[in-house]
Amino acid sequence: MIETIHVNLNNYSYNIYIGEYIFNNMFISSIFLKNKNNVLITNKKIEKKILKNKNQYFYKILNKIHYFSINDGENYKNLYEVEKIISFLLNNLYGRDLNLIALGGGVIGDITGFVASIFQRGVNFFQIPTTLLSQVDASIGGKTGVNHILGKNMIGSFWQPKGVFIDIKFLSTLPKKELLSGIAEIIKYAIVFDKIFFIWLENNLFKVLNLQKKELLYCIKKCCELKVKIIENDEKEIGNRVFLNLGHSFAHAIETFTGYGKWLHGNAVSVGIIMSSYLSFYLKYLKKSELLNIINIFNNIGLPIIGPSTMLPLDYLKLMMRDKKVINKNLRLVIPVSIGKVKLISSIKENILLDSITACQERRFFS
């Protein structure tokens, strides 16, 4: 059975398809086979696993599509890789009737979407996310872009895909650390929107991590539905879509400081959400019991709860001042005020912010 979620964005609407072996479906496979101007963008690792090893299920569809592979990893999410893709497209005489297909995780999706948004002033693209993180978050909503040496995702655009195709069979090829990275974003959705979902996760996260089909499909669908509800009302992040950035200001600081790719994005988000939770506690919003519940859910599943030991609180502040949510040099952060509810705050006193980072690093109240 294939679940379908419609994303209603007027002229930019599309469907998200979720299931197992979804490319066996004639309608879905025809989307990729009927157009001769499809180009699939992937990375070297996926090329080796699926395209060159002739994986029977995926290969029968994907081997019929022209593809181009780039280097794998967050450290390759840059303008150099963008230029390589564009050169490939121009050398092969592709025009504005091109359809790009992103086959990979968040990095491939972000780069492919960005290329689609700028190549000949915009072409269509589709998302086939292959990681848990990209299936529950990164492939949906039209955020595209690349990193700059001074900050993560500083060069980008909003460019909606024409469709998102989520097949859980891809997840069986992932190492546990990649699955855990996706778990962090799943927990984020529960903290931001839904306390009942948070309680469900406390009881079912290990089933999701072990790719048990019923719980996994429920979880992916739930996250997609929550994100779709937000982006339908705030596509360009001028309102409540900013809530999806819970923990990300701290997380992007960690990723920039340590060097892109050294910390998995989900691991950095885990720490970032905990730092945001300490900040909320010290601002007298979040109860201590809920702070500990948040720390526990990340810790129990095996995600990090403290940042890099070499990174000082002032290092976070310096990098966070380049965050996209900064307005008039005023840092704005999303914090949980309770499990299932968040708010955007500004004019944060530096000493409270520094103490919140220190408290996280010291595992304060948590043993």
Swiss-Prot record:
Its cofactor is Co(2+); Zn(2+); NAD(+). One of its GO terms (biological process) is amino acid biosynthetic process. NAD(+) binds at residues 72-77, 106-110, 130-131, 143, 152, 170-173. Its EC number is 4.2.3.4. Binds 1 divalent metal cation per subunit. Can use either Co(2+) or Zn(2+). Its main location: cytoplasm. GO terms for cellular component: cytoplasm. It comes from the Bacteria. Keywords: Amino-acid biosynthesis, Aromatic amino acid biosynthesis, Cobalt, Cytoplasm, Lyase, Metal-binding, NAD, Nucleotide-binding, Zinc. It catalyses: 7-phospho-2-dehydro-3-deoxy-D-arabino-heptonate = 3-dehydroquinate + phosphate. Pathway: Metabolic intermediate biosynthesis; chorismate biosynthesis; chorismate from D-erythrose 4-phosphate and phosphoenolpyruvate: step 2/7. The keyword Kinase does not apply. It is found in: Cytoplasm. GO terms for molecular function: 3-dehydroquinate synthase activity; metal ion binding; nucleotide binding. Zn(2+) binds at residues 185, 248, 265. Belongs to the sugar phosphate cyclases superfamily. Dehydroquinate synthase family. Catalyzes the conversion of 3-deoxy-D-arabino-heptulosonate 7-phosphate (DAHP) to dehydroquinate (DHQ). This is 3-dehydroquinate synthase. The gene is aroB.
